[in-house]
Amino acid sequence: MKLLQKKGYKVERPLNKGSYGTVVLAHRLFRTPRCKDLKYAIKCIKKPAYTFLQEVNILRQLSRSRHRNIIHFVESFEDNVYYYVVLEYCPLGDLYECILNNDFPNAKNQPEMIKNIFLQIIDGVAHLHSHGIYHRDLKPENFLLSLSEDGSELVVKISDFGLACRDKISYDFGTGSDRYMAPEQFEEVDGAGYSPRAADIWALGICLLNLIFARNPFTYPHEKDPIFADYMLDAMTLFDVFPTLSQDTYNVLRACLCVSPEKRSLAKTREAVLAVTKWTTDDEELESFVNEEEEFRASDFMPAEDNVRCTQSDREPLRTPSVLTPANTIQRGLLPSKLPALSDVDENISTSSSPRSPASLAPVNNSERSYDSGLGESLNNMHIGKSIATAVPVNTKRSPYSCSAPAIVFPNSIKGNKDHLKFGRSWCDMDEEDEEDIVSFGSNDDFGASDELSSKHIGLADDWNVLSQWNDNS
């Protein structure tokens, strides 16, 4: 770690830690033509790290065509123990924490803010794809946030290229984060590979649902997930999972969450986002409620024979949900903005009260290569076979308004459990004992006896901070 000082960096504090390294905040002791900013985030990756060179090569390639929605690479160097990657520092953290706390900078108009954030992510992904680079681990934790130079605009930057590749067809199954994986990426079928480009587009659809509802629609993209099995049969079951989903939002999802990879389109996704006027029907439901209240009040002055309310005979029946959760569950997301932060729990799919093995749903992997993203261990790196529990049959005769998708478990405290991420820990997951271990790193100028650090102190560098196919004619 003393090499950092020799290179002109003074460590201020740790930002993240994981199983193979740390991310620290450092400032420049002096400026150079390459390092014009004062603060940087430095990934310190313990050797050996087999994907390091590929990640750095991709970052270098992207730095030559700098894009505002891609994290900027500054430089890299190494000593006998660590690789060091110097990247721009994003002081606002990541998108996951903003969703978790329902706290976005400059969020005066939340519907427009969602559109702005998602369009920036699409533009960043389009830039990657235009250069033949495919991320394969797109999720809110890997979208860092900063402000424009004048401080008036929130800027989203795609980060963590530990699983990125240039292969148009990939055979690396089970890489990334299972809740965001495309079905063909999650599990090998008949020895066929998958398109990382199409897998990235699928992940964008899951990210959008997170952004709007703070929820994931599926626990994993496999037919043994009952909600995903229903979705494969009929994409409109999303309206059962998210009752306030607007038609505009559904049109966006039609372009990116197609079960058939060849039908996914980044250009059509962007076009549909631009056409969105509202992401949810919350306003419509509120207006309907107010109108019904007025009707009830007016009925007090009607003759008795007129004071009767009947249902319409041609009214369409309510959909029957596949997975049921408590009827009083509230879908907490960005819309509406003033709902209290509530935790939601998966039922019939996972057990939230007891920790799960991070790889309990891992697909079988024939490769012995290590796939480890900057946010944590991927399924391939666990070397544990696939074990997916068969879903328990459930009673389906309930109103769809009492149903709920498998949820991201958002704890009330930042220190809460994030076992659902399943790929290592964020800095905010550390307990007090972990913090005591790492605080000493930046306690003095030489980064605290760094030459004697053991693997106890250094962990995985989190990213800082079929059946019927989709009917496009529907």
Curated annotation (Swiss-Prot):
Residues 350-363 have a biased composition (Low complexity). The modification Phosphoserine is found at residues 353-354, 357, 378, 404, 413. The keyword Ion transport does not apply. ATP binds at residues 15-23, 43. Residues 9-280 form the Protein kinase domain. Residues 345-373 are annotated as: Disordered. Its main location: cytoplasm. CDD domains: STKc_Pat1_like. It catalyses: L-seryl-[protein] + ATP = O-phospho-L-seryl-[protein] + ADP + H(+); L-threonyl-[protein] + ATP = O-phospho-L-threonyl-[protein] + ADP + H(+). The keyword Ligase does not apply. Belongs to the protein kinase superfamily. Ser/Thr protein kinase family. This is Serine/threonine-protein kinase ksp1. It comes from Schizosaccharomyces pombe (strain 972 / ATCC 24843) (Fission yeast). The lineage of its organism: Eukaryota, Fungi, Dikarya, Ascomycota, Taphrinomycotina. The gene is ksp1.
